Design a protein with these regions (language model features):
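Short, surface-exposed charged micro-motifs
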Residues: 1, 132, 260
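Beta-rich carbohydrate-recognition and catalytic domains
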Residues: 4-73, 78-188, 194-254, 268, ...
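Hydrophobic, well-ordered secondary-structure elements that form the walls
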Residues: 192, 261
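Extracellular glycan/ECM-engagement signal in secreted proteins
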Residues: 263, 267-269
Length: 323
């Protein structure tokens, strides 16, 4: 997972490390997935040596709900657009964790130290799997987590922005019902992105929420679902936020899996996703290689990593443009 500071050339990458497998019983608090922070000060041209943060992050929860295994969901770590405490705008990362599901951690020093959003006892998505975070226009934090046939959502509201205190709503499952395409029953992680937009029919300023997922019965047909956030009532609580999607755009017509996206400087959506699953031994230099056994447990190497630059008008069939 990666983020670049909005006011400098500093880049932070958070990576799972070591030789443990998240789902194995042998991976536990005494033999955990390791977590490494890797930093660049020149926009990614050069990188410093990795710094292990395993104990600093796992230790946040030792006195409340101890974690046996965890990692930061791959893709985008998001940096707040509105919350700045000290030198940096706040960054947030969603942990895939067991037992008791997702946790959200945040940092005000760009990943040198971390705290638990909502406190160490908070369990925002107890049934969650791989997850991502985003920010509403008013600074509240959304977590969106992988589940079969949809996404889990929850919403964090601050009581005190500076100290990070506040409260989570209840985890809520959304199935994007009413669409011709439905989220996959064999899911992967996707990405949420909320962009400032203009409704093209009348010029009204709104926000548009995007959520990418694979669709159908397998890991296929990665698509981006979209929903208008016209005013505060559309995001008054987690249920209002999760319900009532307006449409979707199918990015891939074939086998496709994990995805991530962010807003580019040119107001287009940078969309990254996995496509074209490569079976073990069929390609001499696969882009992604299974870990840690080489051939992996499912007899495949991995996928091609694909980048597309998409206009919001394309994703929403001309209904919105970025402002």
């Amino acid at each position: 997972a990666i983020v670049m500071d909005r006011e400098s050339h500093e880049v932070l990458m958070m990576a799972v490390a070591g030789c443990t497998v998240y789902g194995y019983a042998s991976t536990n608090r005494h033999n955990p997935n390791l977590i490494a922070a890797i930093r660049s000060m020149d926009g990614g041209l050069t990188w410093q040596q990795p710094i292990e943060q395993t104990e600093a992050i796992y230790g946040l929860f030792d006195q409340t709900h101890p974690i046996d295994a965890a990692f930061v969901g791959g893709g985008k770590i998001f940096q707040s657009r509105v919350v700045k405490v000290g030198r940096y705008y706040r960054i947030y990362a969603a942990l895939t964790a067991r037992p008791k599901g997702n946790r959200v951690i945040y940092s005000d020093d760009f990943g040198r130290t971390w705290a638990a959003l909502g406190g160490p006892s908070a369990l925002p998505v107890p049934d969650g799997d791989e997850a991502k975070c985003e920010e509403l226009p008013d600074g509240r934090v959304v977590i969106t987590s992988r589940t079969a046939g949809g996404r889990w959502f929850n919403l964090f509201t601050y009581d005190d922005v500076k100290t990070g205190s506040g409260r989570w709503d209840e985890q809520t499952k959304d199935t994007m019902s009413g669409m011709a395409l439905m989220p996959s029953t064999n899911p992967t992680n996707g990405e949420m992105l909320i962009v400032p937009a203009v409704r093209t029919s009348d010029g009204k300023p709104v926000h548009v929420m995007l959520q990418s997922v694979s669709t159908g019965t397998g890991r296929n047909n990665v698509s981006i679902f979209y929903k208008e956030l016209a005013d505060a009532s559309d995001m008054r609580d987690v249920r209002a936020l999760a319900e009532g999607w307006d449409g979707y755009y199918q990015v891939s017509p074939t086998v496709s899996m994990y995805s991530s996206m962010d807003l580019q400087a040119d107001h287009r959506i940078a969309f990254f996703y996995e496509e074209a699953l490569t079976r073990w031994g069929s390609k001499p230099n696969p882009v992604s290689t299974s870990f840690p056994k080489g051939e992996g447990e499912h007899n495949y190497d991995g996928c091609e990593n694909v980048y597309k630059s998409l206009a919001l008008e394309t994703i929403t069939a001309g209904k919105y443009r970025v402002r």
